[in-house]
Design a protein with these regions (language model features):
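Mixed-charge, Lys/Arg-rich low-complexity intrinsically disordered regions
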Residues: 1-23, 29-32, 39-42, 111-121
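Structured beta-strand/turn binding interfaces of compact recognition modules in eukaryotic regulators
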Residues: 27, 36, 68
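Phosphate-recognition beta-domain surfaces
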Residues: 54
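Intrinsically disordered, low-complexity, charged/polar segments
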Residues: 58-121
Length: 121
C-alpha cells in the first residue's frame, strides 16, 4: 500500500521511521535524497526485487526517494538501508518543487493538499 504525501499529513503511521520531506542517506551506497512516498512493505515485483544487489526484508517500510544530483533519478529503498541525513543541506533534484513548497530546518515542507499538479513517483 503506497502512502502518499497527503496520507501522512495528519500524523505518524506506526513502523515508519522517516517522514515525508526528510532528507535521508543510503547507508550502503552513501547517496542522499528526499522521501516523497512510503509503502508499508515492498510492493515491487519479484523480478525487480531479485535483480537488486541486496535483498533487504520485504516486510518493512520501503521509501520512494528523490536522489540528490542524480539527473532526476528516484529510488525505492528499504527502511533498514536508510538513515537521517544530519547535514542540514537541501538536495538538488528537478522534481523537488513538485512535492515540496520549501526547505526549512533540514526538512522539506509539503505542498498544501489543494496545490495543483500531480507528481509521479
Amino acid at each position: 500500500m503506497l502512502i502518499r504525501l497527503t496520507d501522512l499529513q495528519g500524523g505518524a503511521t506506526p513502523g515508519i521511521h522517516y517522514d515525508l520531506g526528510l532528507v535521508v542517506v543510503h547507508t550502503l551506497y552513501g547517496y542522499r535524497g528526499a522521501v516523497v512516498a512510503v509503502d508499508i512493505r515492498c510492493m515491487a515485483g519479484d523480478t525487480w526485487y531479485q535483480s537488486n544487489k541486496t535483498q533487504p526484508p520485504r516486510e518493512q517500510p520501503w521509501y520512494h526517494v528523490l536522489v540528490h544530483e542524480s539527473g532526476g533519478l528516484s529510488t525505492y529503498v528499504a527502511q533498514s538501508n536508510l538513515a537521517e541525513d544530519t547535514s542540514g543541506d537541501p538536495i538538488e533534484h528537478p522534481r523537488i518543487a513538485c512535492y515540496f513548497a520549501d526547505f526549512k530546518d533540514g526538512l522539506y515542507q509539503l505542498k498544501e493538499r489543494n496545490s495543483s499538479g500531480s507528481c509521479s513517483i
